[in-house]
Amino acid sequence: MAKLGVRSLKEMVGRTDLLVATDAVDEPHKGKVDLSAILNNPYAKAGSEVTFDPKAEYNFQLEKTLDEKVLVKKCSRAIHGGEKTRFSVEVKNTDRAFGTILGAEITRNNKNGLPEDTVEIDCTGAGGQSFGAFIPKGLTLKLTGDCNDYFGKGLSGGKLILKTPENAGYKAEDNIIVGNVALYGATSGTAFINGMAGERFAVRNSGANAVVEGVGEHGCESVSYTHL
């Protein structure tokens, strides 16, 4: 470490500029792999910080999410006065944790949630990771399309409906419509999935109920107090 010019293991983290590709390799592809893009680190050479600083300010750009731009604003009367609200929105697979910020606002202002289906949001498209994660009672998300991993993670009283498009051209019951680890750690609420789910469906579910038309490996492990 002293020869490398570092005083601790922490100082070595991220210092790929200290690594050199060895020539002591006896195999036919020797010299055919260019590692310069991996090993070159101009920041380290310039003396800049190359490791993550946990004290650095987080900036997740939440103001750019659909929750902040659309959902919370449209649901203001429901959040603060319990007014029934329903509208449609198009989602894409980069819209992660769709509905989670809205759910947090509902819970912040209504500790026991809202009456069932107070807020109904009809979505179309491809849901991103953690679609409907942690949503509370009173919030219903309906998605016509498909969804990525962690659908309904930590579901906390809300309702999720995932439907195969009518013009899909395939049988819903024979095709995966939602990714892995759907409903992981859910504690209450319901989910209806018009198709199959991927691996580890509803693992550690302890109270949420769900209907699905098939699951992959390791589905329903460590579940309790639930109907699946």
Regions found by a protein language model. Give the residues of each.
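Phosphate/diphosphate-binding loops
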Residues: 1-10
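Terminal amphipathic helices with adjacent charged low-complexity linkers/tails
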Residues: 9-61
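Feature marks extracellular polysaccharide-active and adherence modules
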Residues: 105, 124, 134, 142-146, ...
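Short, T/G/N/S-enriched strand-turn elements that build extracellular solenoid repeat scaffolds
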Residues: 110-112, 129-135, 147-155, 180-183, ...
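The right-handed parallel beta-helix/beta-solenoid scaffold, focusing on the short coil/turn
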Residues: 117-119, 137-139, 151, 158, ...
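Acidic/polar low-complexity surface segments
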Residues: 158-182, 206-208
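Conserved structured catalytic cores and adjacent interaction surfaces
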Residues: 181, 186, 191-192, 205, ...
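Conserved small/polar residues in nucleotide/adenosyl-binding loops
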Residues: 226-227
